[in-house]
Amino acid sequence: DSYRDSPSELIFDEFDSLLYPDHPLGRNILGSEKSVKSFSKEQVINFVKRNYTPERAVLSSVGGINHSEFERLADRHASNWKGEMDIHSRTTPFVSKSKIKHVKKEIHQSHIIIGGEGISIHDKDYTAIVLLNNLLGGPSMNSRLNLNIRERHGIAYQIESFINSYNDSGIWGIYAGTDLETIDRCHRLIIKELTLLRDKKLGILQFSKAKTQLLGQMALAQESNVNMMTSLGKSLLVYNRVDTFKEIVTKVDALKISQIQELAQQIFSSHEMSELRYVPLD
């Protein structure tokens, strides 16, 4: 239960539950103390046998090893890997809309997440939402949320936007850590930024800089062998293909200003947004 001592992490789990109330995507990955204690050794072994199977696996490698040697090692160490794959039926999740929840806790700082339904990882606008998220509240210091709320107004200890996209669903959100006295103002300023993205087209220069910055971040990420290895494996697992960096550049370059605004109008609908707050006890 130690993770409950970190409200800035716990709020993300509870926000998932708020938007996916009747679906496994809304369940806490760690489970509960009761559920974990209920597992037997045999249950865990059988679960691994049914789900961690060769048919579901991808082996990814980056570094000073040629492909034939990698295949030889894989065959040597994984040739006896067996399993009885479970066939899971998946129900497309319903994303709840307009949910408002305020929770009082024994904390000093306040926390807020605003968000709603996004798009799936297979959606034609997936590259667009990656750029939109990066522009709005990505890791760079010049993101809109960081500049206008944390730097200009000084009312957020931390602020960021995020997207969680799955095979058939997705959500977006904005997290901010602030004080009880400034949480309402922080909320208003976040809504203001979303409204601007909905109602006002990006300038040509701003859009060009956003593309360049996103591609620069992707290029830097590829300098890490671990990041590249993980990215290649995930791409093959999800899409059954691996895009070269040149192909990624082509996708980003093909984005249009109108496409970004239309996407913002689609997902940043004010009457469909949900909100979760953690605030200190009175």
Q: How does the language model describe each region?
A:
Residues D1-D86, T91, H102, I112, ...:
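Charge-rich, well-structured scaffold segments of protease-associated domains
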Residues F15, K124-L136, R144-L147:
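Active/ligand-binding-proximal structured segments within catalytic/core domains
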Residues T92-S96:
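Short, charged, surface-exposed secondary-structure boundary motifs
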Residues K97-H108, I112-G116, K124:
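Phosphate/diphosphate-binding glycine-rich loops and adjacent basic-rich segments that engage nucleotide
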